[in-house]
Amino acid sequence: MRIGTGIDVHQFAEGRKLIVGGVEIPHSKGLKGHSDADVLLHAISDALLGAAALGDIGKHFPDTSPQFKDIDSMILLQHVGKLIAEEGYAIGNIDSVLVMEKPKVAPHIMAMRGNIAACLDIDVSKVAVKATTTEKLGYVGREEGVAAHAICLIEERKQ
């Protein structure tokens, strides 16, 4: 049994879609990034890669590569899931938290969980997504950006 953690932060930017957990959320701003900047999927990807000692998201999908420009992070997460399986691991569970003031994401959490589970070919009961604010403190409180934290458990696949 192995545990991994992941953290990601993205700044808000004009003229971008806000995509979190593979869900497009109506908002006046999106997140700045080389890919679609899905902060939640990036944190989960890092947690999974870390648990398997496979490096981090930047190693596998460098932001200097045109191949990953504006790529859907669901594709990246699906690739991470395949890497985990190829290393002989199965995902036990994923727990994650979004840290953002606005917009409220509670109405979208079930869709996010479903997207993550489908992408990784695991049961949705193994995926938790929560959301919180910073009570108006710091860059999140000033609505300058969004953070996501994730932790996961992976286990050796039974032969």
Swiss-Prot record:
Its EC number is 4.6.1.12. Keywords: Isoprene biosynthesis, Lyase, Metal-binding. Binds 1 divalent metal cation per subunit. The record marks 34, 133 as: Transition state stabilizer. Signal peptide: none annotated. PROSITE patterns: ISPF (PS01350). Pathway: Isoprenoid biosynthesis; isopentenyl diphosphate biosynthesis via DXP pathway; isopentenyl diphosphate from 1-deoxy-D-xylulose 5-phosphate: step 4/6. Pfam families: YgbB. 4-CDP-2-C-methyl-D-erythritol 2-phosphate binds at residues 8-10, 34-35, 56-58, 132-135, 142. One of its GO terms (biological process) is terpenoid biosynthetic process. Its cofactor is a divalent metal cation. A divalent metal cation binds at residues 8, 10, 42. It comes from the Bacteria. One of its GO terms (molecular function) is 2-C-methyl-D-erythritol 2,4-cyclodiphosphate synthase activity. It catalyses: 4-CDP-2-C-methyl-D-erythritol 2-phosphate = 2-C-methyl-D-erythritol 2,4-cyclic diphosphate + CMP. The keyword NAD does not apply. Homotrimer. Involved in the biosynthesis of isopentenyl diphosphate (IPP) and dimethylallyl diphosphate (DMAPP), two major building blocks of isoprenoid compounds. Catalyzes the conversion of 4-diphosphocytidyl-2-C-methyl-D-erythritol 2-phosphate (CDP-ME2P) to 2-C-methyl-D-erythritol 2,4-cyclodiphosphate (ME-CPP) with a corresponding release of cytidine 5-monophosphate (CMP). PANTHER family: 2-C-METHYL-D-ERYTHRITOL 2,4-CYCLODIPHOSPHATE SYNTHASE, CHLOROPLASTIC. Belongs to the IspF family. This is 2-C-methyl-D-erythritol 2,4-cyclodiphosphate synthase. The gene is ispF.
